[in-house]
Amino acid sequence: NTIISVSGNFDDTFFELLEKYFGTKKMLDTKPYLPDAPYISKNNIVKEKDIEQVQLVATFKGIDVMDESVYSLLVFNNVFGSGMSSRLFQNIREQRGLVYSISAGHSAYINTGVFDISAGMSPESLGEVAHLISKEINTIKRNKLTSAEITKAKEQLKGNYILSSESTGARMQGAGRSLLLNKPIYTQEEALKKIDAVNADSVAEIIDRVLDSSTMCISA
């Protein structure tokens, strides 16, 4: 099955070409095979190599692509680990200079998701960095986010979304991906309202869901 997404300056001729080359194609009456989401129990893996750097990643079970709490997750991670103003970057790299890089991010799939925290450092810093990451996780779970942090994160996300929407390529990809996953295609106004709807309770809930120590795996 094929989905064609178009954005930008086009006219009826384009639709005529689509109809000419794709209009006679019949949709297959089949459903894609969707295996159960894999689950790996809590695990720690350390592999030693004779190299000058250490790469550390801590992963947690995330949310799938259909989960509307993604907006709360984006707000949470904007504060926690996304970008140079995040807590992870400021407290571990900027203030202490213990890592070359550090960030957190989320990857969503059709039936599961992965939230990861990754960092690169010298071998002698591994223990302290792991301790500080754990400390940041415990701090944000215990104290949650302030209303000022949530407001600032929402404004940053809305600004980034508006800027990205100026690209016809980004709009094309977003619409195509939504159609492929049977998700609604939101207008810019609708998407901004989704971000605005995020509140302290929804952020606290997603923090507890994602930063669940029972699903954490660490590899270095």
Per-range role (PLM):
Residues N1-T30, D64, G81, E94-A220:
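Charge-rich, well-structured scaffold segments of protease-associated domains
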Residues T30-R87, K194:
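His/Glu-based metal-binding/catalytic segments typifying zinc-dependent metallopeptidases
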Residues R87-Q95:
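Short amphipathic alpha-helix segments
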